[in-house]
């Protein structure tokens, strides 16, 4: 998380809504040898207290979960390079704007009996965004194929103790300079630059 308090929004609801909508992040656990990292889709509860996810059975993280372990999920949003020329101000330096939320807590394996319900909820969450396409459901799979797939993955849950977010959107610049940079960022370098420009204008 960025140390500048101008970028460290304390709006927990905003962090939760962003992470819930994004529903994809980087799960990290510490070990004696090296951090273990996995990119995971997930479901976050409406109050931000619980994350549900699944991991493929061969994932090294699962081998460490003989008991609940401390973990963190980093959820990234849009990001982009900001040229100092865009501000219309003297003596500026390049920077990179971005949005990120970190969910920290204890992660554990869950009983295999919970997996089908989790997968149904996850697929429903994502399929709803594809409307008016008819929703895919696991019922479209043959029982044998579904059973083979279910044996390959394991349900997990993280109980969230802390949520922190960085919304680095040039809030430390005058409104006119931030607006000017937002106008230019869409043609620049980064990811989801249209979204980033909108967030900068609203900062």
Regions found by a protein language model. Name each.
Residues 29, 55, 75-77, 160-162, ...:
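Pocket-edge structural micro-motifs
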Residues 108-203:
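C-terminal edge-of-domain segments
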Residues 21, 36, 47, 67, ...:
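A short, structural micro-pattern
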Residues 16, 91-92, 145-148:
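A generic local secondary-structure boundary/capping motif
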Residues 21-57, 73:
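Short beta-strand segments
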Residues 57-121:
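Short, structured beta-strand-loop surface elements
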Residues 52, 72, 102-104, 155-159:
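Beta-strand secondary-structure signal
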Residues 2-26:
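Short, basic/aromatic recognition patches
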């Amino acid at each position: 998380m960025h140390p500048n308090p101008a970028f460290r929004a304390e709006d927990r609801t905003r962090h939760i809504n962003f992470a819930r909508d994004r529903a994809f992040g980087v799960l990290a656990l510490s070990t004696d040898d090296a951090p273990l990292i996995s990119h995971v889709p997930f479901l976050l509860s409406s109050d931000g207290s619980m994350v549900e996810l699944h991991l493929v059975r061969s994932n090294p993280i699962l081998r460490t979960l003989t008991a609940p372990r401390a973990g963190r999920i980093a959820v990234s949003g849009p990001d982009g390079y900001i040229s100092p020329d865009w501000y219309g101000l003297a003596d500026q330096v390049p920077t990179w704007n971005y949005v990120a939320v970190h969910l920290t807590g204890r992660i554990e394996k869950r009983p295999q009996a919970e997996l089908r319900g989790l997968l149904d909820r996850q697929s429903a969450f994502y399929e709803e965004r594809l409307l008016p396409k008819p929703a895919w459901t696991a019922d479209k799979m043959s029982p044998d194929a579904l059973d083979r797939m279910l044996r390959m993955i394991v349900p997990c849950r993280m109980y969230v103790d802390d949520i922190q977010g960085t919304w680095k959107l040039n809030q430390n610049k005058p409104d006119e300079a931030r607006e000017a940079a937002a106008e230019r960022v869409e043609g620049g370098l980064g990811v989801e630059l249209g979204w980033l420009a909108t967030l900068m204008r609203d900062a």
